Design a protein with these regions (language model features):
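Membrane-proximal transmembrane or re-entrant/amphipathic helices at the cytosolic face
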Residues: 1-25, 422-426, 430-432, 451-528
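Signature of the first transmembrane helix
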Residues: 2-19, 27-87, 108-124, 141-146, ...
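Alpha-helical transmembrane segments of multi-pass membrane transport and lipid-handling proteins
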Residues: 2-18, 44-48, 107-132, 137-138, ...
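Interhelical loop/hinge segments that connect adjacent transmembrane helices in multipass membrane
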Residues: 10-28, 32, 167, 210-255, ...
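Membrane-interface junctions at transmembrane-helix termini in multi-pass inner-membrane proteins
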Residues: 29, 90-99, 149-172, 190, ...
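Transmembrane helical elements of multi-pass membrane transporters/channels
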Residues: 35-50, 176, 197-200, 204, ...
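Membrane-interface helix-loop junctions in multi-pass transport and translocation proteins
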Residues: 56-73, 129, 137, 164-167, ...
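Specific pore-lining/lateral-gate transmembrane helices of multi-pass inner-membrane transport
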Residues: 93-109, 268-384
Length: 528
């Protein structure tokens, strides 16, 4: 099932009365890597089922169905991010968590979610009128039922994250994904149209809530009091503002697009955006987990923050640029073979959006880094830059439909990325040129890969374009070209990424020490 992917509320790694003692670092690293292997395996199985069903459902449903769902999920996704007032981060990260505080947070979350549900019941007709689409009233009211269920999963989910217990949680996620996908498949085949996506989303929420409570008994009687919570509420406010700004940066495109060009054209854009952006969440989580110890050591010595940030950027660039430029290079084949003829209008948006996804992935990883070194206000100010800039670009781009909206991403976001990196310079000690140097060789190798795939498609007889073997052959050509190019351009970076991935899968230990910068990479620290 392909619905709007909301930002998962991973608590920021801020260290205010939080976290383990320094002597526990080795144990935590081991637990994180073991837990993440569980997560990787379960997510692989779950996503295999999910993507198979998703592609099948896309072929059945219409662009209009996906456009309606995209319109409805814009306000739902926003309040999903805000439904705990940031206090879920307190549950995970506060070192001394009393039963009274847990009960108080639970009470606040219950009240807040009930208020959100009531607000949606009343405002659904107004939202539908804004989009000039009466069918949205019923869709939004049904989707709002999630806010009755969400409070019940807050405590068990936070406890599992607090204990870094990804193993049991990954089982719940696997069951949830499979059940939601099967529900979507059943409803799509029965001709439910957009309600396939609506009820699929509700099914996913309900099963996840039930599963989390079965494996982690954390519920308690709520306490409806704010006494002694001033510090926690201020921390939650910072997390909430951060999430709201990220939403304004990344999700106002659908809000504006739905108003300007209606549900059918928005459906093409929404599917293209979801196909391009869904891997961002998976790859970001993987690389962040590998770089986690580097973040923990970011302030351990001179240049530590700089080294950690450059290591993270280098590892992400090695995977992100070939992956997403590869999607862009074969977007026509993806549309034809996997989505079907009625989705041809999604081809160009998919090509354009894929080009900018590596930068979005790097920006997403910058936020936990800044929280990890104790500067959440810098993270907020960085996302404020994008939250003010990107909606203006979307307003201009929406005049030319889905392609214009995609161009707004492709042209404006690189500028936002560079400005944001420059803004973070005083904290990280990393110049914009430092970041660009870590990205330079993966970008060059990826562009060469793009050119080779383009040439093979257009100038070499390489099978029939409507056959899956043709697509597989193009993927193979691209992979061989990129790997070969990187072995020539930067063999050391390839070795580093290989060791990190082998450590992740338990093949051998990995020191997590950033490789020494070569004289070609080295530049003076900012402010030195």
């Amino acid at each position: 099932m392909l619905t709007r992917k909301t930002h998962r509320k991973h608590p920021p790694s801020v260290r205010v009365e939080t976290g383990p003692a320094a002597g526990d670092d080795v144990d935590i690293r081991t637990r994180v890597l073991i837990a993440l292997r569980w997560t990787a395996m379960s997510k692989f199985l779950g996503q295999l089922v999910s993507w198979t069903v998703t592609l099948y459902v896309i072929r059945i449903l219409s662009p209009e169905d996906y456009g309606l769902m995209a319109m409805a999920t814009v306000p739902i996704a926003l309040f999903y991010l805000l439904n705990t007032a940031g206090l879920d981060a307190v549950l995970v990260q506060k070192r001394e968590l009393s039963d009274q505080l847990r009960a108080q947070i639970f009470g606040i979350v219950i009240v807040l979610n009930l208020l959100i549900f009531i607000v949606f019941l009343g405002t659904a007709p107004w939202i539908a009128a804004f989009y000039r689409e009466p069918r949205l009233t019923a869709i939004i009211r049904i989707l709002a039922l999630q806010f009755i269920l969400l409070p019940v999963e807050t405590l068990p989910q936070a406890q599992l994250e607090r204990e870094i217990n990804f193993g049991r949680r990954s089982i719940v996620e696997l069951v949830t994904i499979v059940a939601g996908s099967l529900m979507a498949l059943t409803l799509a085949r029965a001709g439910f149209g957009v309600w396939t996506l609506v009820w699929g989303s509700l099914t996913t929420t309900a099963i996840r809530m039930a599963g989390l409570n079965l494996i982690q008994r954390s519920l308690c009687w709520p306490r409806f009091s704010l006494g002694g919570m001033k510090t926690d509420l201020l921390f939650g406010r910072a997390a909430t503002v951060d999430r709201a700004l990220r939403f304004a940066l990344a999700d106002t495109d659908r809000f504006i697009g739905g108003r300007f060009f209606g549900n059918t054209l928005l459906g093409y854009y929404a599917v293209a955006n979801d196909l391009a952006s869904l891997p961002v969440n998976k790859l970001t989580g993987l690389i962040n987990s590998i770089a986690l110890p580097a973040f923990a050591r970011a302030q351990s010595g001179p240049g530590g923050a700089r080294a950690a940030l450059l290591t993270m950027t280098r590892l992400m660039s090695l995977l992100a640029f070939p992956f997403f430029l590869g999607i862009s290079s074969i977007a026509p084949e993806i549309s034809t073979l996997l989505l079907g003829p009625k989705w041809q209008a999604a081809t160009v948006p998919l090509q354009l959006l894929s080009l900018v996804m590596p930068l979005r992935m790097l920006m997403n990883a910058l936020q936990p880094f800044l929280w990890g070194v104790g500067r959440p206000e810098t993270s907020v100010s960085i996302f404020l830059i994008g939250a003010l800039s990107m909606p203006l670009a979307f307003l201009v781009g929406a005049q030319w439909g889905p392609v214009g909206l995609s161009l707004a991403w492709a042209l404006a976001y690189p500028v936002v990325f560079l400005v944001s990196i420059a803004h973070a310079r005083t904290l990280s000690g990393v110049l914009v040129t430092d970041i660009l140097r870590t990205m330079e060789r993966p970008i060059l190798a990826s562009l060469l890969m793009y050119a080779v795939v383009f040439a093979v498609k257009h100038y070499v007889a390489f099978g029939q374009s409507e056959h899956i073997l043709h697509l597989a052959s193009l993927v193979l050509v691209g992979a061989v070209t990129y790997i070969g190019s990187m072995l020539v351009l930067d063999r050391g970076a390839c070795r580093e990424s290989s060791e990190a991935l082998r450590a992740f899968f338990g093949v051998r230990p990995y020191s997590y020490d950033p490789r020494p910068l070569s004289k070609n990479d080295e530049t003076p620290l900012a402010g030195h």
